[in-house]
Amino acid sequence: MSVCLAVTKTVAVSSLGIYCGMLTSACVASYAAPVDVLTQLAKPARVIARVGGALAAVSSAFFALSYFGAPAHWRHPYLLYGMLVAPVSAAYVAVVARVRGAHCRRACEKRRAQSASVHASTPASAAPEPALDDSVVDLGAAAAAAESAPETHVTSAEHVPVSHHVTPASAACARAAARHAAVLLLPAAAGLLGSVLGLYGEGLFV
């Protein structure tokens, strides 16, 4: 079955180019932006990651259609290389998610074990009863102190906006996300470069 190679290759290379551009922007933002900004943008980043994954899947599908739906003399290797970008990226993401999940489970089990050992080593002790002398209060002195104490009123202008606190865990997560984005960029850039050079050289070097 023959397909319109001009259309399928255009869609494949365009989708791969947009996906590669999104990864490049993610890498630059991950290394240039402060950690507190990255933690605030975690939710939009997940949406962008889903869109990028969809573009990579579309690119691989059209590369496969261009390769397997074309005559034998038009089945160039760069189509296979472009088709493998999404599967390789998906395999890397799956391995990272599996390793991270195992690490989180081990950390949770370690925290639970430490919490159980702390509770076991510190039994609850009875609270000491207050002495009778300590319970006697001079009401006259207390009233005089209350009258002489200056009143402090907090106005709305004194409220300072609370900044987002960056924990070590969130900083480590941001650094890991930057490394993973850089790793994912390598096969995407290689596939895009091979596709562009392959399209350019189809009529010249075959």
Curated annotation (Swiss-Prot):
GO CC terms on record?
A: mitochondrial outer membrane
Q: Transmembrane stretches, by residue range?
A: 13-35, 51-71, 77-97, 181-201
- What are the BP-aspect GO terms? autophagy of mitochondrion; macroautophagy
The highest taxon in the source lineage is Eukaryota
Database matches in InterPro entries: ATG33
Instruction: Indicate the principal place this protein occupies in or around the cell.
Output: mitochondrion
Localization of this protein: Mitochondrion membrane
Which controlled-vocabulary keywords does the entry list?
Answer: Autophagy, Membrane, Mitochondrion, Transmembrane, Transmembrane helix
Respond yes or no to whether keyword Transmembrane is given for this record: yes
Topological type in the membrane: Multi-pass membrane protein
Keyword Iron-sulfur listed: no
What the protein does comes down to: Involved in the selective degradation of mitochondria via autophagy during starvation and at post-log phase.
Identify the PANTHER family for this entry: AUTOPHAGY-RELATED PROTEIN 33-RELATED (PTHR37278:SF1)
The family classification in the record reads: Belongs to the ATG33 family.
Q: Which protein are we looking at?
A: Autophagy-related protein 33
Name the source organism. Lachancea thermotolerans (strain ATCC 56472 / CBS 6340 / NRRL Y-8284) (Yeast)
Identify the coding gene.
Answer: ATG33
